[in-house]
């Protein structure tokens, strides 16, 4: 309620205003800007026990009337609300009724509506793309036009059928009849209807949960389904923010960072440091395009001409046209202008944050599915060239085949453990960048690509891909004005992470120059080095390295956020303590006892006790939520949920726990035991070994060993 929403707080507070405790109570409410409405005595004893507090609204004509039916008096008042507070405009959503749509009919209509292949091939890239998208949209509009309806303001109960709603109406009528008559016969009828209705609702909920969970194709979908079933999204909080407010805020946030850096001088001559070159993309066959379309996850956004799952169903009728668009784009070095638009949805970072503040939102960028299909075609060829010629940083694990956050953490952790075994202390520094993907300078990125040997239409295509991009914000049914993007790699794109990895390639040489080792995962960079415990040059070396990194960041238009950069000191032995801080400009970096690194809580003793405690808490909360709906779940559905929401957490980066004593990992084993009991709906005292055998679950210690062997293979 921090956004100025009118608020009235009233009731029997059982507080005597003439007592000292009342002063503290009034001070507390005043801190929330609540003001008390003065009245006469509200109790027959002459005290004011029934109180009214208001905020952002006025109350007049307050009247206290003794009714002689209670010790408390009746209080009436007029509540004056502002027009904005009294009337909140109804939100409207737009949907299509796709249930009645026949995909085969849509496919035939699209085939007949698209120009012939000879006519389509004569169109340039942008014209062909516009024609293709407009044809798909118009065909879908003919079958399923958009219809508007008021948005729901209450949580839905999707398992309620028309029969159950009719049954509920009869139940409520019987309840009212019994309350009115107080007749035993009416009570029996009401109780019978209540028992029958409860049983039918239980059956309907069980069937609904079972179908929803069994239809989930992967862990991510299962997690979203589980969250939506357990905690339906609440109605959006009242807010005066508009889509244009968000668009301007997101644009200015990036522009403020970019404006801090000096303007680059255009270079006329670029020297290619790579002996190999990549000047053009190879054309794709219709079979290649079909594989790209059908193998991709069917994500849909408002920019798609038709829902992606429909596009995949009718793909056979549109593949020839799509093949021309993609090959024309690759051949001409032109990225279609229609695909340069992004649709951004603001998401509140945490439910507890004030929804009236723009800085509490993060942008979620959505791109058209066909645009990402074209990006995948480029990604496959570009990444193959980079890998074959060893042009990517070997210490970059982000979005690379055979690498993950776990391999990145293993590399760093093993180095720290080996240093401790050699009686050396170590320093681990976790760098934090502000809006790193959004501030990438296109001129520097293209220069880096040239030096790697990328030229010709391939470089021209990448230049076209980066330039003239824009976005619009969708917020509560309205769309903002378009905002241009002068910097950055597209968020939510296929190529964005790869291009950012290329952009960061030269940072490694700056770090290694100071004798530091490093490892990266996308924009998360961790650098570390080991030293003798009595080395007096440690602080100077760290300061010099961070200073050069900061200079490199400035030269590459990236902002190093020193306030969020973390420093972890791992001593040579538990009894040794290093007490120092790093001063860089006006910022001071002090060592932390723990630091979160790629989702793992690391501590200065490498005991991982804090990480195990954090994992245990999150798993217990997940099990608690699963138990809430366990009566409605089958054994198979429960097992799916537990494996996706609990075991996945136990297994995340569990190779880091290899070698820890059994007492340290025991809390994780207790979680697995509890999970097995939830699957079979057994009590807490049930023997767990037979349950684990029936589930074919390895114990936690064995899972850690198995993961270690799998990664070393």
Across the structure, where does each feature detected by a protein language model lie?
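Active-site palm subdomain of RNA-directed nucleic acid polymerases
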Residues: 1-7, 378-396, 419-421, 497-530
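Surface-exposed loop/turn segments and immediately adjacent short secondary-structure elements
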Residues: 82-86, 109-112, 119-127, 132-138, ...
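Basic, alpha-helical interaction scaffolds
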Residues: 100-141, 586-657
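Metal-dependent phosphoesterases centered on the DNase I-like endonuclease/exonuclease/phosphatase
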Residues: 1-58, 108-115, 119-123, 190, ...
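Arg/Lys-enriched, amphipathic patches
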Residues: 6-20, 82-236
